[in-house]
A protein has these predicted regions:
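Terminal signal-anchor or tail-anchor transmembrane helices
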Residues: 1-30, 182-183, 296-297
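Cytochrome P450 proximal C-terminal region
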Residues: 1-5, 13, 36, 155, ...
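Cytochrome P450
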Residues: 17-33, 191, 275-279, 301-313
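Cytochrome P450 substrate-recognition site 1
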Residues: 31-48, 57-150, 171, 176-185, ...
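Conserved cytochrome P450 K-helix E-x-x-R motif and the immediately C-terminal K′/meander segment
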Residues: 48-67, 243, 251, 310-313
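Residue-level signature of the cytosolic catalytic core of signaling kinases
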Residues: 51, 123-126, 261, 283
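Short loop-to-helix capping motifs
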Residues: 84, 140, 297-298, 306-310
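Cytochrome P450 heme-thiolate monooxygenase catalytic core
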Residues: 103-111, 145-305
Length: 313
């Protein structure tokens, strides 16, 4: 059966290509008034070939020709590009509600509990409630100040490491990265974790999120992603990350009866879920999604200005 399916797909590909070419040469008679300027596109891939070698440079170059607002096609997906501060302000501030939604991407959905977090969730009641929880309970000024001791403790440990090195060569960027990761880990998860415990999972997730998914741009060719093994790899990583996050949650649930003066992010989320204090049912998968997005910040490189200023001091 699988053989017959593959034979059908590959044998029908030339016909599909011919149909696409005909469509490009004989466009629809529908009106396309008020569309921004657009560079010529190729059948099937649209303007994707013009994104090399770097999208930011390519977009800057095309903006000089087609203006600050232009229409591109990434595969079959139309994309409007704004290249000015004024345009960005219109989108991000003036008309933010209109542009606030996010497309659902298959690989992202597999890795984030169907976009159950704040970063990748579509605009809607769930996203608004989770944003409210984050602003009022996780990122409030009082909450951030309560973790000052954590930041001071980890900074002292880093300084001691530098002092103990004497005149030996040290990798300052690596030390800053460790400091950042430890602070985030203690604030979010309650304790530090060895990088090896989560590094393979996080590296795999970052790699998949950055990979080119054909289905994102040409939905009817999404089966190519399955043939490439992207779906299988995403499902494997999703299971590994769920095992890790479930372990974190169970560890916190065991200690919930003990008095904890300084609650971490997981403690707060579990408390909100248990007490239903916000009037919004915070599901377990939502908590897991928030934790994983937080863990992904472990992989973010530290700002280069920090080691530079430290070295000068």
């Amino acid at each position: 059966m699988s053989f017959n399916l593959q034979v059908f797909l590959f044998s029908s590909f030339p016909l599909l290509l011919v149909l696409l070419l005909l469509k490009s040469f004989y466009p629809s008679s529908k009106s396309h008034k008020n569309l921004p300027p657009s560079p010529p596109k190729l059948p099937l891939i649209g303007n994707l070939h013009q994104m090399a070698p770097g999208p930011h440079r390519a977009l800057q170059s095309m903006a000089q020709t087609y203006g600050p607002i232009m229409l591109l096609h990434f595969g079959t997906v139309p994309v409007v590009i704004f290249s000015t501060v004024e345009g960005a302000k219109e989108i991000m501030k003036t008309h933010d509600v209109v542009f606030s939604n996010r497309p659902f991407l298959d690989i992202v959905g597999r890795l984030t509990y169907d976009a159950g977090d704040i970063v990748f969730a579509s605009s809607g009641e769930q996203w608004r409630q989770m944003k409210s929880i984050s602003v009022l309970h996780l990122l409030s000024k009082q909450r951030v100040q309560s973790y000052q001791q954590v930041r001071e403790d980890e900074t002292v440990l880093m300084i001691r490491t530098i002092q103990q090195a004497n005149e030996s060569v040290i990798n300052l960027s690596e030390l800053i990265n460790t400091l950042t990761n430890n602070v985030i880990s203690r604030v979010a998860l309650g304790r530090t974790y060895e990088r090896n415990e989560v590094k393979a999972i996080l590296d795999g997730i970052v790699e998949l999120l950055a990979s080119f998914s054909v289905g994102n741009y040409i939905p009817w060719l999404g089966w190519i992603d399955k043939l490439r093994g992207l779906h299988r790899r995403a499902d494997e990583l999703a299971k590994d990350q769920d095992d890790f996050v479930e372990g974190v949650l169970k560890e916190h649930e065991k200690k919930k009866e003990s008095s904890v003066e300084r609650k971490d992010l997981v403690d707060i989320l579990l408390e909100i879920q248990r007490d239903n204090s916000t009037g919004f049912q915070l599901e377990r998968y939502m908590i897991k999604a928030i934790i994983m997005v937080t863990c992904l910040s472990f992989e973010s490189p530290p700002p280069s200005i920090i080691p530079m200023r430290t070295a000068r001091t």
